């Protein structure tokens, strides 16, 4: 499928990894512009990615009772990521010490990298197994709609 939603999620994970690296580099260099750019990515594209998972993918996987704890845990982690991102933004806006920003970024990066690894190892393989072509197309359409502002 040309616009496969599972592949899109995987690709976003790769992009998130790149942005996490950029965020780390900017934090250690005290590069406020670099921090702002990476944080903007996590406030927009990564947030939309989490919406794709929670609104379109997770509900379709809840039919497998064994996945429910994973799905609930991942959704909770999404809230934690958002809180950690806001904390970094507040530190940057408040012109905090570079070390304080770097420490907050390090926590965020570790948290998000572990989350991505868990999704790649558990969530996405489950989606590959469980979603038929019709369901994949429905998920893909919902994801496209989010990008068109619907």
Give, region by region, the residue ranges found by the protein language model.
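Small-residue-biased structural context
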Residues: 1-150
